[in-house]
């Protein structure tokens, strides 16, 4: 059975999707941008955006009864691959030394 997760401390969904869904002990989260849920504004700069996106994910997971340590796989979309090191620094602050599997892609027109 599927359980829909709605998180009041993450930005409202911008389309027809849920913050997360849980089934059989697994939680599947939707992607998060670096949008501050209090203001609805995108954080300025790639480090601030990465930080806010990870805060949003953490809040969704907490609502679902999980933590960042429960994450098995992440996917990062960057507009500019030159931001890779800056995002890695912020990412490392949230995961310590127990990193989940990860993919990272450069995308245009994000």
Ranges and model annotations:
Residues 1-110:
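Short, polar/acidic, helix-capping and beta-turn segments at strand->helix junctions
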